[in-house]
């Protein structure tokens, strides 16, 4: 089997080789397919570090705009989309879990993920004007982050035509974002903060805060008693 694939590959032009990789190796769980995926991605990504593991069914658009650090794991079914003139950077020792969706969304957007970050299954992250995730951030499952807010003030115009506002959103180092949290436009998360499961963040959260609810509000500082007591 290996000889057959090697001989067939050597006869292909560049476009056919890319199609061949996508068809044959992207959804194959064998160790050989894993090695071939790594070879392919190393040749097309802006940079791919050492000891990177890219799972089956991963979708990467515009790989020349994407940098992957050392010891990174991108799990099955993840999607990384870098729009033209944007970029995605993933730091060292980071895990992007199953079915995570990263999309810069627009040409001047970007997503920068720091070192030793864990992004949980089913999380969706957009980077319209920039998304910066600090080192050692822990993100649980099914989080949604979109640094964009629709304009809807004109009742005579369709909302879909009114555009919106976008800004860079930052998540400080060592923050913990609970499962099913939604982070909206202006929802910066301070260093060392904890956001409780199911919360909706619509305004900045100060460093070392514990915040919960919809909308999320600070209930205490880490290391201090409950602010309501």
Regions found by a protein language model. Give the residues of each.
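Terminal amphipathic alpha-helical/low-complexity segments used for targeting or macromolecular assembly
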Residues: 1-51, 136, 142-143, 149-156, ...
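C-terminal/domain-terminus segments
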Residues: 188-212
